[in-house]
Amino acid sequence: GESGSGKTTLGLAILRMIPSTGEIWVRDENLQTLKKKALKPHRKDLQIVFQDPYGSLSPRMTVNQIVGEGLRIHEPELSESEKNNKVLEAILEVGLEEQMLERYPHEFSGGQRQRISIARALVLKPKLIVMDEPTSALDVSVQAQIVDLLREVQRKYDLVYLFISHDLKVVRALAHDIVVMKEGQVVEQGPAQEIFESPSHEYTKELLTAAFM
């Protein structure tokens, strides 16, 4: 859907980062009914990568601290060396190097910062990652690299992405199923191939025409 259609709001609501009504079912549990303590185990399994690779990383923290923050919260029983090993594994997974661990976000390009954000999500071995326009702030060539990385990681760990985007070319490269939103409502949903080849809603047809004309 276009900007303002409710995509990001829906993603944040699913993660219970904003108040919402309705039901959110994960592993046979309705997250809406859970108190903070009962919700904590699910927080580990439900991660997010934000759109802005510049604003979503604390400028006062090193890469090691940023990527390892979730481990300190969700796996406090880990020793320092175990935590460091998991952080190293995560940053190598996303194509960064060990010597980058003690550097700060301002020392990196946009694409590298987004890789740090992805490593921060991956280090907890989540089941679902909400990807909130993770490539929209990047140059086209860097976008392609991040899309390739996301596909590779998804296959390796059998991850589910809720990939939020208005860029249908990126959606086509990644999505198995698509939900089209307009003004806060779902207007069409189905398998990606079906949506791209035989859209039924006029709004979906307009989006596809604009993206691929």
What are these regions (language model features)?
Residues 22-31:
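Conserved ABC transporter NBD signature motif
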Residues 30, 81-99, 208-209:
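Conserved ABC ATPase "signature" region
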Residues 104-108, 112:
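Conserved ABC ATPase signature
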Residues 125:
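Conserved catalytic motifs of ABC-family nucleotide-binding domains
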Residues 171-173:
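A short, surface-exposed alpha-helical micro-motif characterized by mixed small hydrophobic
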Residues 189-190, 198:
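ABC ATPase "signature
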